[in-house]
C-alpha cells in the first residue's frame, strides 16, 4: 500500500478514503476481539491485526512515512511480546491464561520484559510505540478526520485494556495451572532483554522529526 501511494494520489485519490476507513475498522474490530481472548498468543495475534489497521489507516490519511515508522517500532515490541509469551508457554505448558497467574515471582526476567513490551504497545512515552502511534494520530488530526482520530484514540485505550488484562491473568494473582513453572534459560531470556532495548529506544529515531512532514494529501 505504501509503495502504491503515488498511484492512489495521482490516479484514484478517493480510494485513499476507503483505505483509511478499512484501516480504522480493522484497528477497532481486532482490538475488541483481542479483549475476549483467553489464549495468550491469540491476544497478541489479534493485537497485531489491530496495529496493522493503524498502519493501513495512516496510509489512507497520507502519512505513509508514519505507517512505516509504526511498522518499524511495532516489529520490536511485538517480537518481544511473542517471545515473552513463548517463554511463559514453555514454563506452564499451556496457552491459556486461565491456567497461568502468579508468574511474576518465578519468572522475573520474562515479567519485566513483557511489561516493557506491553507499555510500548500501549503507546506510553518514552517507549517506542508512543512516537509512531502519535504520528498516526497527528495525521488524522491534520487531515481533519476527527471521527477517525477519536476511533483511533479509543483503539489505543482498548489496546491498553487487553494488554493489562493479559499481564494480570498471566503474571499476577495466584498460579492456577499445574506443575512447577520456572524462569526460562538464558538462551530465551537474553533475546528478551535485547528486544527490550529496542522496544524502548527504536522510537527515538524520530526525535529529529524524520517521519514528520505535511501530509502528501495536502495538494490533492
Regions found by a protein language model. Name each.
Residues 1-192, 196-204:
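Hydrophobic transmembrane alpha-helices and their helix-loop junctions in integral membrane proteins
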Residues 211-216:
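Conserved small/polar residues in nucleotide/adenosyl-binding loops
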Residues 219-220:
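N-terminal low-complexity segments that are often proline-rich with Ser/Thr-Pro
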Amino acid at each position: 500500500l505504501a509503495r502504491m501511494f503515488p498511484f492512489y494520489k495521482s490516479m484514484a485519490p478517493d480510494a485513499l478514503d476507503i483505505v483509511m476507513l478499512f484501516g480504522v475498522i480493522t484497528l477497532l474490530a481486532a482490538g475488541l476481539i483481542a479483549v475476549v481472548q483467553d489464549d495468550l498468543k491469540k491476544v497478541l495475534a489479534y493485537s497485531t491485526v489491530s496495529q496493522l489497521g493503524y498502519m493501513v489507516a495512516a496510509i489512507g490519511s497520507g502519512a505513509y512515512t508514519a505507517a512505516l515508522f509504526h511498522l518499524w517500532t511495532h516489529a520490536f515490541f511485538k517480537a518481544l511480546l511473542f517471545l515473552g509469551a513463548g517463554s511463559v508457554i514453555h514454563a506452564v505448558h499451556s496457552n491459556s491464561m486461565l491456567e497461568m497467574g502468579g508468574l511474576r515471582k518465578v519468572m522475573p526476567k520474562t515479567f519485566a520484559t513483557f511489561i516493557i513490551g506491553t507499555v510500548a504497545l500501549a503507546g506510553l512515552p518514552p517507549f517506542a510505540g508512543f512516537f509512531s502511534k502519535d504520528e498516526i494520530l497527528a495525521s488524522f488530526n491534520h487531515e481533519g478526520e476527527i471521527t477517525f482520530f477519536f476511533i483511533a484514540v479509543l483503539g489505543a485505550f482498548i489496546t491498553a485494556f487487553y494488554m493489562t488484562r493479559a499481564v494480570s491473568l498471566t503474571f499476577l494473582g495466584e498460579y492456577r495451572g499445574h506443575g512447577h513453572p520456572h524462569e526460562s534459560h538464558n538462551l530465551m531470556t537474553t533475546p528478551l532483554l535485547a528486544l527490550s532495548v529496542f522496544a524502548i529506544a527504536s522510537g527515538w529515531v524520530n526525535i529529529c522529526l524524520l517521519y514528520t512532514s505535511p501530509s502528501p494529501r495536502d495538494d490533492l
